[in-house]
Amino acid sequence: MEPITIGLWVSAGMLAMVLLGMRVAFAAGLAGFIGIFWFFWDKFDYAADKIIYWNERREVWDGALGRAMQIAGSVPQSKVSANVLSLIPVFILIGYLAYHAKMTTALFEACKRWFGWVPGGLAVSTVFATAGFAAVSGASVATAAVFARIAIPEMLKVGYNKQFAAGVVAAGGTLASLIPPSAILVIYAIIVEQNVGTLLLAGFVPGAFSALVYAGIIIGMAVVFKTVGPPVGGYSWKERFESLPPALPIVAVVVILIFFVYNPFGDAWGTPTEGGAIGALIVFLMAMLKGMKWKQLKEALLETAKLTVMIF
């Protein structure tokens, strides 16, 4: 049997197990192990009608099972222990430090004042703010969790549909899967053995385009269904420009990371991990200057640890 056929059957089996209620991690692990065993059984042409004696059957079974267990035990460990994965907790820390230092709130406020006047303006502002936050966080869960606290109450306050508000935040959170420094792309780069920096950079344009598409869909829905997302007006040009300075720190971090890791004018100044470490230090210093308390720092570290453990 062709490996791709085995893969399709195993994927179908995993989907069936998930639909039957098994946890995704266990379903994926079991399906993967069965797929590896099946591959080696088929590779060495272990057909039942060719095996005459019981000891031959046992030898064949133990051989395929042994190879499957060996790979299942070594490959995940080798992938998870890759040094480049250390950038994931670093960028998650950047995101939570920015949140507890109120940088993300300032970013959302700036987006609200500039884009709130369009139909579904708060939802559009949420999408653009999540895109900006994704550029320093890299984790969809962190992005969705942060803006669920910031944006949903604001949208509900002006009469947004609850399901619509939650859907906007959930959709905005997915931008962190594309916009660098995406944790998903880091893991994918390790699996397919590609350069992490190059793959992260490749996600920037699709991520930015997705944000624009989301914004367009939101505006269209708000125009067709008037009560879904009413516009928010009343901001003067002075108020709009006044909202920019508080949002500059998080924008500055994004620019620094781009030039440090991806430098469009020459060679990169460092690796993504080094860029993340410098970004975390900069955000930490900014947070201290903005008056971050020990309790807030502790919460940022705990939330970073919890999300990192969940990802790994």
Where are the regions a protein language model picked out?
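Alpha-helical transmembrane segments of multi-pass membrane transport proteins
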Residues: M1-F312
